[in-house]
Amino acid sequence: MAFNYSGDQDRSEPSLFSYVQQHLDRDFSPVRVLKEESEARILLLRHSISGQFFVLRDCAGNPEIYQKLMTVSSPFLPGVYEVAAQDGRLLVLEEYIQGDTLYSILEQSLFSPGKARRIALQLCEALRILHGFGAVHRDVKPENIILRGSEAVLIDFDASRIQKSSGTSDTVVLGTTGYAAPEQYGLSQTDSRADIYSFGVVLNVMLTGDHPSVRLAKGHMGRIVRRCTMTNPDQRYPNVLRLAEAL
């Protein structure tokens, strides 16, 4: 069964992109569509021999983030195995994270401060790795966090970008309303502190079910959330290491 890739594909010239396509067609079979949007199609695949599940992202985007993720290994980030780009299209073969999203879990019940702190520290470690190679996730939210047993795994890097050394604002506005930092709306170039803002909203939602502008978590956690979500990035924690220390 051949894969139905989005976009026009030119197989006339050998390339890494066409090689990856052929590899996927030969060695994997599609199980189901996990997510489909105008610019992205995400499939669950099964390896024909091992039976192991993988995720295939067929989307528009920059391969640089996923290429960098191929070089790291962390229980809090998905493994990335293949990356190929052609004419603005991107194919990414990555680890399938089996578990429930933080969003679906929070629909059932909120977290104790202790459990929220444990998850928050794991997210700090995932962000520390991303920020370490100059990446900004830009879409940290409960839907993009999967709980695999006791591990919180940060997924979906389609909105991510490599921080530029120059420039005053982002060229593309991406992120999720309510979780995106103010600077993601074109006010200035985003850096790692944009993820700290989103992190603060997620932490507050884990504890209260609400955005901090509606109801702020109590006590020490509330003070952390308040600093994370300051409108001025200079007033937030400067990096996730300082944030983890506060937790």
For every predicted segment, state its role.
Residues P30-Q67:
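ATP-binding glycine-rich loop module of kinase domains
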Residues S73-E82:
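Conserved HxN/HPN-centered segment at the entrance to the catalytic loop
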Residues D87-T101, I105:
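Conserved short submotifs of the Hanks-type protein kinase catalytic core
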Residues I119-A120:
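Activation segment signature within eukaryotic-like protein kinase domains
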Residues H131-L147:
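Catalytic-loop of the protein kinase fold
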Residues N144-D156:
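Conserved protein kinase catalytic/activation segment
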Residues S169-E183:
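Conserved activation segment of eukaryotic-like protein kinases, specifically the C-terminal portion
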Residues D195:
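Conserved catalytic-loop aspartate of Hanks-type protein kinases
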